[in-house]
Amino acid sequence: MEKSQRLTQYSKGSGCGCKIQPAVLGNLLSGMRENGKVYPEILVGNDHNDDASVYDLGNGMCLLQTVDFFTPMVDDPEVFGMASAANALSDIYAMGGRPIMANAVLGWPVDEIDIEIAKKVLQGGLSCCDGLSVPLVGGHSIDSRDPIYGLSVTGLVEKAKLRTNAMAKASDYIAITKPLGIGMLSAAHKRGLSDEAQNKALYEILTQVNTIGASLADINGVHA
């Protein structure tokens, strides 16, 4: 596969590896809300380090909002689109909610990578959303140095079923919904060191949406 088609070669990091380091991000955001306006309807905001923000609608329901996008963690464009969409949608399910609509975020080096490959990325994201009956209603795109793709997702959750990181208790068991080691597989894939079977396993794991999060929120005794 030529570099023009190997999406992972167009970014320094891949997947979560492209995120700004926590210490740098903490410094960037420090003091942003000091003496700022307080919004009582916001139950979870950017000071909670959670999967999505939460707005209390006042009728027993809450609105969930998240945005997540990545640089390529795989070379297959459709899988990249599906994986990025799955990650964003999973944020809503993780808090006990269900996504109701999404918007796409696309950055693409239009002079470097064929636009037909970008179409495959978009198709992957749409396929993931359609598979869960989540309308992909629009989005925003820019001409960027690195290819990026993701979703901004809106969801709903019953307030009584809302689950946040802060609700976890010291005696809780931890349920792992995906196998560990995805980052290592992705790194091997980027370096061309993974075989066909490993790539297949990576694709299957990355495109799995954690819908089980919403189901677990229905169980008495599940705190976070």
Named regions from a protein language model:
Residues M1-A224:
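Helix-biased detector of long, well-ordered alpha-helical tracts
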